[in-house]
Amino acid sequence: MKQNIKKIYEIASVATICTALFKKGLKNQFIQGLSPLNKNISKMLGLAYTVRYIPAREDLNLIDVFKDPNHPQRVAVEECPRDYVLIFDSRKNPRAASAGSILITRLMVRGCAGVVTDGGFRDSHEIKNIN
């Protein structure tokens, strides 16, 4: 994101940005019902890098799938560009554990601007204390 544009977004409210998008024909460009884990962070800003989860089949999605380095969740964590916000679209399913403290820490080390989910996080008590 260009620095001059970033400075504008840093001072604009979410409502203002949503209205501007709406005027451009982009409706429903936000996720409802979100709340920050860390209440001390006032604003998170970055381009979106989105991963969409689909419901897992318990007969096919065994724990071994997470050992695969090409698992979509791992790929997203490694490919999310610096200064982007990783968005986990979990279809508003809190049982879809989007990530835990290890992956969130990895994203932080890689320079990710933040993480958003409409699902759940494992280790949320640890994630909210990650600096």
Range-by-range predicted roles:
Residues 1-131:
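Feature captures the catalytic cores and cofactor-binding loops of soluble hydro-lyases/lyases
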